[in-house]
Amino acid sequence: MDDSQTPANPYAAGAAYVQGRFVPVGQASISVLDWGFTRSDVTYDVVHVTGDAFFRLDDHLDRFARSMAKRRLAPAEDRARMTEILHRVVSLAGLREAYVAMLALRGRPRIGGSRRPVDCDNHFIAYALPWIDVVPPEVQARGAHLWIGSGERVPDAAFDPTVKNYMWGDLNSSLMEAHDHGYDTSVLCDGQGRVTEGPGFNIFVVKDGRVLTPAHGSLQGITRRSVLELCEELGLPCAVADIPRATLEDADEVFLATTAGGVMPVSRVGPVAGGQRIMGNDRPGVVSVRLKELYWAKHRAGWYATPVRHDVMA
């Protein structure tokens, strides 16, 4: 019997691969001198598992490879080995529904005091946790309340937003601001007043029958891509475009998209003149619900599914 199937599975809370070993996620650690920690010199990606299968695993690995190349990160593990590790951490944890992360970190300098990135040994970490929803299911059911942060998103010219990263100072500030005002989560605009993204998700606006998602300042999300494909399948006009803040404030519907939760409807947006914008009778909108239902129905039918391999042992 595999460890993941025993009653006392030490990996039940999650499994990790770090420093070349598989360990319970609570035992995973890195050096406090790792530049991934001290300088956020790290890129990562997250893929989900549902029904014992990865969703769009190859697409996530492709994006992870692009991010590593842009950040000049080259861990020892090649793509084939990384794939094996991802399967193994899910299997060890015994999870059929999981949040699975892969990280490439700069590492610590081999030469004490060096400030040269090339003096660091890059390394790879992966872990699997029980399913995570960025927006809790009960909040999705009534529609999330979305706060437009008072700060600005880091400009594209300062850091490429298509590289998934942990430099979340601006996003976390907006999230705390949202919570201070009684909202569930937040989104930021850029210096030109265009809508960008939120902490861990892309945003979509439905206006006059068109489904729009920002062209700038945001990650090219895999769930975002999936939603655009679903719009085409349903015959819904959709576009990647600049979205002024005013369009968000006057939207017919708004929803969020992320690996950790899928399609997540919004029912309120604020602050706007007069307080807040309440959409769809303060409930998830018709288009949002239609896309959410189709997204999960296609999951159940095996859409872009890669079954978890439980025979990977190393």
Residue ranges and their predicted role:
Residues 91-98, 236:
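Short secondary-structure junctions
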